[in-house]
Design a protein with these regions (language model features):
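Register position in tetratricopeptide repeats
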Residues: 102, 140, 147, 181-182, ...
Length: 304
């Protein structure tokens, strides 16, 4: 009986060792980074070389990345060979898409992200790391559609990105940009709110949040002209600023801040009559506006 159990134990041990060796190769092939799921040693070797070439290219070219440069040509070649050796090698498609991203080869990048998504979606269980990569793939496809001005496609991909990874700040950022550009201001504001909730210091997020909020309040066209007017005023380009502020009140006759700054420009240029007229408009809309009241008195003093 003991011999029988010993024999069974030895057989099971051999089976387990065999399975572990396959598991180890399938899921940890590569450079000890992400799990690589391939049974092809050739594919794994090619991808390892491709990654090394990519990293060398990044260091060598310092941002001047073009697909015809030697190291990038080699990185692309080895990544493609990895895919030829195993067409379902998920990590190889991901890395090749990255290489195309670095070299600004947008069409091929989009193609590889699409293939990567197809392969990932076939998996029954997706690791947190794979989810982040999937979200990034959706984000890059969304950005590619944005570049082509395919805003419907862009929104769909970006929404998929934040569905997979709600903390994907870049996807929320571009949703905010796209929604603003097509006039969906409330959706844009919601996206900027999410960006700030994830990262309060995300570059320009506060600016866009304020811009969209004011666009909702005053009207997109009116606020766009108002903002342009203020920037021109800061540069002391008064004629151009006057034109922009006048456009702002044309789109929104109740835009008190535009009237206020028109008054300031006319006052600084010595046109006290026009200055007073614009500050009266401010007070008509906002009777308690103390700044307009003060400046109106100053203009009227100059007219006496």
């Amino acid at each position: 009986m003991k011999k029988r159990y010993l024999k069974m134990f030895l057989i099971l041990s051999l089976i387990i060792c065999g399975l572990l060796s396959v598991f180890s190769f399938s899921f940890t092939a590569g450079q000890g980074e992400a799990a690589w799921e391939t049974l092809s040693q050739e594919a794994s070797d090619y991808l390892e070389i491709a990654i090394n070439k990519m990293e060398e290219a990044i260091k060598t070219y310092q941002g001047a990345n073009y697909p015809n440069k030697e190291l990038w040509v080699e990185a692309i070649d080895y990544a493609e060979k990895a895919i030829e050796a195993d067409p379902d090698f998920i990590e190889a498609h991901y890395r090749l898409a990255q290489i195309y991203q670095y070299t600004n080869w947008y069409y091929r990048e989009a193609r590889e992200w699409g293939r990567y998504i197809e392969l990932i979606q076939k998996k029954e269980v997706i690791s947190p790391e794979a989810e982040q990569k999937l979200a990034f793939a959706y984000y890059r496809l969304g950005y590619a559609d944005y570049q082509r001005e395919d805003y419907d496609g862009c929104i769909l991909y970006l929404q998929n990105a934040v569905k997979v990874d709600p903390e994907n700040t870049e996807a929320h950022y571009w949703l905010g940009r796209v929604f603003y550009e097509i006039g969906r201001l409330n959706d844009s504001l919601s996206s900027w709110r999410k960006v700030l909730a994830i990262d309060p210091h995300y570059p320009r997020a506060k600016y866009f949040y304020t811009k969209v909020g004011n666009s909702i309040k005053y009207g997109k066209e009116a606020y766009s002209h108002y903002e342009a007017g203020y920037n021109l005023y800061e540069q002391r380009l008064f004629e151009e600023a006057i034109y922009q502020y006048r456009q702002a009140v044309r789109y929104n006759p109740n835009f008190s801040s535009a009237y206020y700054w028109l008054g300031r420009i006319y006052y600084e240029r010595g046109n006290y009559q026009e200055a007073a007229s614009n500050w009266k408009e401010v007070l008509r809309l906002e009777p308690e506006n103390t700044k307009a009241e003060y400046w109106l008195k100053q203009a009227e003093k100059q007219l006496k």
